[in-house]
Amino acid sequence: MGHVIAMAGKGGVGKTTLCGLLIQYLCESGKKPVLAVDADANSNLNEVLGVEIGPTLGELREEIERAGADPKYQIPHGITKADWLEMRMSDALTETKDFDLLVMGRSQGQGCYCFVNGLVQTQVQKLQSQYPYIVVDNEAGMEHVSRGILPNLEKVLLVSDCSRRGIQAA
């Protein structure tokens, strides 16, 4: 069972940068492979880590939602949406030599991120036993932590600046 470390705090205080540095440190210390999870709708951990990504979980959600209504998003006949989504999940995992990256991303439409958050939770649970460390870059605030989206969370690094608002958010 991998150690789950999550970043939390106000937006713009360096959570993603610190997350990238922690992933680099773990990899250089031989604690690899690391599962990096970008659980922010405004995903950019891949840029910090210097990797190109495939489809995000949010994009897969869009494909499921539009299937049947938009010819561009078709699920093959004879397969359920749930089975198709399960099959496509591997496409959302970007693999490198030292770490793998799972990106939540955002959907194009309006609405709640509950389904995409559920996908993050499910994937982390499925993958957790394959990695000694899982490092999660969260969106601003504490919602991911307080809602229990991250299973078996061991450590939360609260990142802040010196402002009153930054400390209140952390």
Where in the sequence are the language-model features?
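Short loop/turn elements that form and flank the Walker-type P-loop nucleotide-binding site
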Residues: 1, 30-31, 95-97, 128-131, ...
